[in-house]
From Swiss-Prot:
Protein name: Protein Vpr
Native organism: Human immunodeficiency virus type 1 group M subtype B (isolate JRCSF)
Miscellaneous section: HIV-1 lineages are divided in three main groups, M (for Major), O (for Outlier), and N (for New, or Non-M, Non-O). The vast majority of strains found worldwide belong to the group M. Group O seems to be endemic to and largely confined to Cameroon and neighboring countries in West Central Africa, where these viruses represent a small minority of HIV-1 strains. The group N is represented by a limited number of isolates from Cameroonian persons. The group M is further subdivided in 9 clades or subtypes (A to D, F to H, J and K).
Biological classification of the source: Viruses, Riboviria, Pararnavirae, Artverviricota, Revtraviricetes
Subcellular locations according to the entry: Virion; Host nucleus; Host extracellular space
Modification Phosphoserine occurs at: S79, S94, S96
Length: 96
């Protein structure tokens, strides 16, 4: 019978260390795109809801990822990612 190979894969960081690094990167990016008061309020909400737990860390990561994704998708003026809004010609000549 075949056996699973022993731990031959790349060494992985502990989950909590990786999670905290991800949160720090998301916070740094969010500060560039959203008002600090919004982010502070979000942090307060998460703390009041989850306390100082890993569930709170995971929740704020998920929310920040969603906010940033939508922000970029709608069209952030700091980024080339997003929907480009085409301006219509006033005389309607752009369509035939």
């Amino acid at each position: 019978m075949e056996q699973a190979p022993e731990d031959q894969g790349p060494q992985r960081e502990p989950y909590n260390e990786w999670t905290l690094e991800l949160l720090e990167e998301l916070k740094n990016e969010a500060v560039r795109h959203f008002p600090r008061i919004w982010l502070h309020s979000l942090g307060q909400y998460i703390y009041e809801t989850y306390g100082d737990t890993w569930a709170g860390v995971e929740a704020i990561i998920r929310i920040l990822q969603q906010l940033l994704f939508i922000h970029f998708r709608i069209g952030c003026r700091h980024s080339r990612i997003g929907i480009t809004r085409q301006r219509r010609a006033r005389n309607g000549a752009s369509r035939s």
